[in-house]
């Protein structure tokens, strides 16, 4: 398994992924394996599970290299968040049918996040998870009366640790956390988690999207 962490607020979206690849058959590990992609100013995604399965799900939107992981394509993708999500979920539905009829078995635990045109959102996609995540797709948004919403593809203990650290920071600061503070929380999760979960390391890659208001316009970068 791997760990992908994603968090959204009113103005920022942050995603991170560890960089350890585990050969399930031999239990060998190696590093330098990228698991997150920023497709454009509105769309990011991260993958866990069997990388071949995720490369099929996101085919055409990134390269998959067995040594280096998921890499940005040379193409510039001028595609909206909603259109991208529709394409990926249509593929997922076909894979789900194959999985349920035993035509093919998948191991997917992926996250898409970004701006849907009006607000930031996170979508979790799971199929045949080896750690017991329920199959299906879940879309989450930040509640109006709460400062953030997070989703994690990984062990339940990692999720609990993230929430404990995030809420501790909010009680301490009494204000919105910065991108740097979110990155620090994610780093602390893997610093601790890599001590008991040998499928992850504490070398994180990060991608971010910021919502900026300028001269009456709303920009994303």
PLM feature spans:
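N-terminal nucleophile
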Residues: 1-221
């Amino acid at each position: 398994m791997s760990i992908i962490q994603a968090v959204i607020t009113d103005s920022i979206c942050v995603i991170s992924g560890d960089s350890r690849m585990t050969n399930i058959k031999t239990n060998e590990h190696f590093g330098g394996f990228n698991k997150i992609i920023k497709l454009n100013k509105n769309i990011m995604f991260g993958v866990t599970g069997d990388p071949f399965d995720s490369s099929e799900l996101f085919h055409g939107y990134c390269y998959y290299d067995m040594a280096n992981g998921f890499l940005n394509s040379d193409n510039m993708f001028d595609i909206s968040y909603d259109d991208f999500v529709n394409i990926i979920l249509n593929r997922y539905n076909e894979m789900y049918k194959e999985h349920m009829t035993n035509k093919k078995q998948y191991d997917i635990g992926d996250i898409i996040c970004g701006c849907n045109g009006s607000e930031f959102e996170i979508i979790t996609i799971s199929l045949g998870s080896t750690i017991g995540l329920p199959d299906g797709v879940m879309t989450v948004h930040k509640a109006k009366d709460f400062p953030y919403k997070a989703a994690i593809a990984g062990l339940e203990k990692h999720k609990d640790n993230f929430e404990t650290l995030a809420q501790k920071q909010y009680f301490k600061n009494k204000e919105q956390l910065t991108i740097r503070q979110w990155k620090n929380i994610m780093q602390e999760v893997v610093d601790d988690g890599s001590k008991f979960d040998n499928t992850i390391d504490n070398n994180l890659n990060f991608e971010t999207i910021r919502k900026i208001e300028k001269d009456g316009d709303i920009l994303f970068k």
